């Protein structure tokens, strides 16, 4: 399955919530007056959804929010199911640990897609916990571990899009599980977020029910 490259706002409208696929310069409800309307000719026509369709819709929503493809998502679920504790919470934590997501959460990318591009273009470095040196990486799916330090490479620090993203991030706020110094363009992943710190609009139990069939 190829990565979606069409209009991002249409995806958010389809899911009925802001998937944070746009920069956030304008609020979601301001960018479109159709915020509560599903795209298409019959967007206002809503049939009663089946249990399966609700579960599938929730999976699609989370995949699109984090920019993850089907096979990747299924692998994340399998690994989460093997871990102790709540499978759904482990799944969300794995998605939050993705390097592209961490770069976005730290405020170096205005969207996850932009953060993914920064990583792919080798503009991001990582220093593993206990190590002394940073290493340039280009794999967005790297799982960031507690104590890892993420930094923008020296050659990329003057990029206007990074500076704009930082400005947006100061308005949005930085999650408590991260420690970021925007003046140095680096930050530390302190620990995995608790469920209460993660997006409230996600109902991960529906995803667990879907994969449990």
Curated annotation (Swiss-Prot):
Task: Tell me if Membrane is a UniProt keyword of this record.
Answer: no
Q: Which organism is it from?
A: Psychrobacter sp. (strain PRwf-1)
**SUPFAM superfamilies, per the entry:** Alpha-L RNA-binding motif
Q: Name one GO molecular function term.
A: rRNA binding
This protein's name: Small ribosomal subunit protein uS4
One GO-annotated biological process of the protein: translation
> Gene of origin?
rpsD
One GO cellular component assignment for this chain's record is:
small ribosomal subunit
Per UniProt, residues of the S4 RNA-binding domain are: 97-165
